[in-house]
Amino acid sequence: MKSIKNILWIAPVCLLSVSCNGYNKLINSNDYDAKYAAAMNYYNENSYSRAAQLFENLTLYYRGKENAENIGWYYAMSLYKEKDYFTAGYQFKRFARQFPYSDRLEEASFYSAYCKYMDSPDYNLDQSQTKEAIEEFEMFAERWPRSTRIPEVNTCIDELRKKLIKKDYEIAYGYYFIEEYHAAYESFKQFLSLYPEATMREDAMYYMLESSFLYAINSREDKMYERLQQVVNDFDKFNSSFSNSKYLASAQNIYTRTREAMANMKK
């Protein structure tokens, strides 16, 4: 009984060993047609890691040949299915450059952007990848405005912009929190210009107003009046945009104190 159990345990290990040995021999083989057939078979059986390795191995040999486009496409797709989005995105972009007349060009361009979307980090980290993804999606929408992918592209852009909105708002608020009021003012001003759709525009505009006031009131005397006048302008914009704001009482207090400071400077 014990020997039967040992056989049952050893059998799959042997099969795995044979399978691995066969795969390793295939990788080192010069039979490229067999490699190509095996790569397609692995891909169709969802063995994407092995498929990707074989397709990569075939790329140089088939360059400029009949199957080059297919290999480039399935190599990129294998990496994508393996969730290696960084390398997959690079390969989709490379495919688009190498095969500009391919029937798969639209899909390759979409996946190039989508891989950057999938690789985009949390909002509190560096957002270079996020910005690149937005740029690629916008280029895709401009080139294929009637693509069936457009709704998905727009959804992805909206999600990516939400990350940028949150990050830039927290940067601006961080300056306000540490009392760097000039930097806070400029950051909130840029935020409002860049993100007209932001849900925290009211908060941003109020903190910009308060930063404007605190920067002005602590300025040198020869600069103060001009900066106080800017506070008045900022209040007018805030009051016009959010006349029923939860910050209205505080904003009106800032306006009153600003007018008083300006009047005192004229005495």
Regions found by a protein language model. Give the residues of each.
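Acidic, polar-rich low-complexity tracts and alpha-helical solenoid repeat scaffolds
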Residues: 2-7, 19-267
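Bacterial N-terminal signal peptides
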Residues: 9-17
